[in-house]
Swiss-Prot record:
Protein name: Large ribosomal subunit protein bL31
SUPFAM superfamilies, per database record: L28p-like
Keywords linked to the UniProt accession: Ribonucleoprotein, Ribosomal protein, RNA-binding, rRNA-binding
InterPro entries noted in UniProt: Ribosomal_bL28/bL31-like_sf (IPR034704), Ribosomal_bL31 (IPR002150), Ribosomal_bL31_A (IPR027491), Ribosomal_bL31_sf (IPR042105)
Highest taxon, organism lineage: Bacteria
Its biological purpose: Binds the 23S rRNA.
The protein's assembly and partners: Part of the 50S ribosomal subunit.
Gene Ontology molecular function: rRNA binding; structural constituent of ribosome
Amino acid sequence: MKADIHPNYHTITVVMTDGTEYQTRSTWGKEGDKLNLDIDPKSHPAWTGGTQQIMDRGGRVSRFQKKFQGFLKKD
């Protein structure tokens, strides 16, 4: 095996949308960094079975909706 080709694997803290935190090991960020989730299994409609509102961070959802407004409408 080649040496020094694998990324650093360390402990980070994941913050869920409801504020709960847990620690896991990851290659993301640096040791001790916090990863704040925009959407997670507790808030995603695919896992909750509902039509919850998706938080629009950075305006991505509204830009998408504006771009494809009326795309599937039947005349």
